[in-house]
């Protein structure tokens, strides 16, 4: 079923590119190399990411080979890719097609590159995993430790300055704005020093969630807030330190159409960073 879904997304991307070739012919070489020369979505994605992450020391071809091997050996990653790109289309008001995140959105790029580094970390290739983490951080200004776990349907919006620590767990359908830190307090040096973010959480720009705490499902974290204690499900917290200011309905959030549900993302976008 996942293969069918990603094939449909790929066919839609090919259709959109065929239209844009006529509208923006100056980009024809770009579309050809990034999209049209490839036989599948994952081939295109691995090309785009390897082009950005390669250096004079490790070539684009070698990086692309790593990505292609992972996609071949762990087909479950395809489901994460599908759900991630669908999340961007559903929640980002600036995105109306699958082509945009594939080509242009560094939050999507950083997340999918992290998924490769996470696979490498879990299969014992830690040095290679850390190399990719370093390149992802340098290229996208997004620092995600490869040991962190990130579920599917996650959106990193704008993405600049996001930091996600080693022991972080992020469940499905979470939205994270720019300049967010999910880290430790500096007082605990165990592996259990980082937060757990439950399903459907929205974390506003510049928020810091620190320590071995839990943010409950459907909670909303206001921009610039500092969270040092557990947050119950379906509440909004704001401030320094963060305090509960209202109840929210996660069921309502997920049942509404894009134009309505996006207001929950939009009100948390303000803060430092771009």
UniProtKB/Swiss-Prot annotation:
Keywords of this entry: Acyltransferase, Amino-acid biosynthesis, Cysteine biosynthesis, Cytoplasm, Repeat, Transferase
A family per Pfam: Hexapep
One Gene Ontology term of the molecular function aspect: serine O-acetyltransferase activity
Subcellular location: Cytoplasm
Matching SUPFAM superfamilies: Trimeric LpxA-like enzymes
Predominant place of localization: cytoplasm
Pathway: Amino-acid biosynthesis; L-cysteine biosynthesis; L-cysteine from L-serine: step 1/2
EC assignment: 2.3.1.30
Catalytic activity reported: L-serine + acetyl-CoA = O-acetyl-L-serine + CoA
SMART domains recorded: SATase_N
GO BP annotations listed: cysteine biosynthetic process from serine
Any one Gene Ontology cellular component term annotated for this protein: cytoplasm
Similarity comment: family membership: Belongs to the transferase hexapeptide repeat family.
PANTHER family: SERINE ACETYLTRANSFERASE (PTHR42811)
Name of this chain's protein: Serine acetyltransferase
Species: Buchnera aphidicola subsp. Acyrthosiphon pisum (strain APS) (Acyrthosiphon pisum symbiotic bacterium)
Higher taxonomy: Bacteria, Pseudomonadati, Pseudomonadota, Gammaproteobacteria, Enterobacterales
């Amino acid at each position: 079923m996942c293969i069918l879904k990603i094939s449909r997304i790929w066919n839609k991307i090919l259709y959109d590119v065929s239209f844009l070739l006529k509208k923006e012919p100056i980009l024809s070489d770009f579309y050809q190399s990034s999209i049209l020369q490839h036989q599948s979505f994952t081939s295109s994605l691995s090309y785009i990411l390897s082009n950005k992450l390669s250096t004079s020391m490790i070539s684009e071809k070698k990086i692309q080979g790593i990505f292609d091997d992972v996609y071949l050996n762990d087909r479950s990653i395809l489901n994460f890719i599908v759900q991630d790109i669908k999340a961007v289309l559903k929640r980002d008001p600036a995105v109306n097609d699958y082509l945009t995140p594939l080509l242009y959105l560094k939050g999507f790029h950083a997340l999918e590159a992290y998924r490769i580094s996470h696979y490498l970390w879990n299969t014992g290739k830690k040095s290679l995993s850390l190399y990719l983490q370093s390149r992802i951080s340098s290229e996208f200004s997004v620092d995600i430790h490869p040991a962190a776990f990130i579920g599917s349907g996650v959106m990193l919006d704008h993405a600049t300055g996001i930091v996600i620590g080693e022991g972080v767990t992020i469940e499905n359908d979470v939205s994270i704005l720019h300049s967010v830190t999910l880290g430790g307090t500096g007082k605990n040096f165990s592996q259990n020093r980082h937060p757990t973010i439950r399903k459907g959480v929205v974390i506003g720009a510049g928020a810091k969630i620190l320590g071995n705490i839990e943010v409950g499902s459907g909670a909303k974290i206001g921009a610039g807030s500092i969270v040092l204690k557990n947050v119950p499900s379906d509440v909004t917290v704001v401030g320094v330190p963060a305090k509960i200011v209202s109840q929210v309905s996660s069921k309502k959030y997920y049942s509404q159409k894009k134009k309505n549900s996006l207001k929950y993302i939009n009100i948390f976008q303000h803060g430092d960073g771009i």
